[in-house]
Design a protein with these regions (language model features):
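Extended ligand-binding regions for polar small-molecule ligands
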Residues: 48, 128, 132-154
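A local structural motif
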Residues: 72-82, 116
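Short helix-loop capping/hinge motifs at secondary-structure junctions, enriched
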Residues: 36-45, 123-125, 136-142
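Secondary-structure junction motif
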Residues: 47, 51-76, 139-141
Length: 154
């Protein structure tokens, strides 16, 4: 995704490597929480609402910049944060610890079950979700089918 905090850096890297960002949709950030979370009944969740709960983020490794972070907001903004390496662990901690993570709001119940829900985050920011591909390259038939399937699903 591209956002106001990472767009300049990522687009420069894309350009320098003869790549192209193709936007699929624009999303407003959402909080992923357990359906039984104390904030689950709220229509919209504020940053202040989240301060009491652990923020779950993917470990980025020692050499990765925060510009490549999968999360939309910095873990520095929250007193409690836990780094995880995989989605299953993240969702188990969302459920077990009343934790949360922030993402696009796109969640598939067939893949993730019905225990995790997405609630809008009360921020005036957007995420431009897309794919990155080589410039001047035509997708194979299978790659084209895959991208079209993604578009239909989203």
């Amino acid at each position: 995704y591209l956002s106001e905090h990472n767009e300049d850096v990522i687009l420069k890297l894309i350009k320098n490597n003869q790549l192209k960002f193709e936007e699929m949709f624009v999303a407003e950030p959402h909080v992923f929480i357990c359906k039984d979370h104390p904030l689950a009944e709220k229509e919209m969740i504020s940053m202040e609402d989240l301060r009491l709960y652990p923020y779950l983020v993917y470990e980025q490794g020692n050499n990765n910049s925060f510009y490549f972070s999968e999360e939309f907001i910095s873990m520095l903004d929250f007193p409690k944060s836990i780094q995880v390496r995989d989605r299953a662990t993240l969702f188990n901690l969302v459920i077990g610890l009343n934790g949360f993570t922030v993402s696009s709001g796109v969640i598939d119940q067939k893949l993730n079950g019905s225990s995790i829900i997405a609630k809008p985050l009360d921020v005036d920011k957007t995420m431009r979700i897309g794919i990155i591909k080589k410039k001047n390259i035509i997708f194979s038939r299978y790659a084209s089918y895959y991208v079209e399937a993604l578009r239909r699903h989203l």
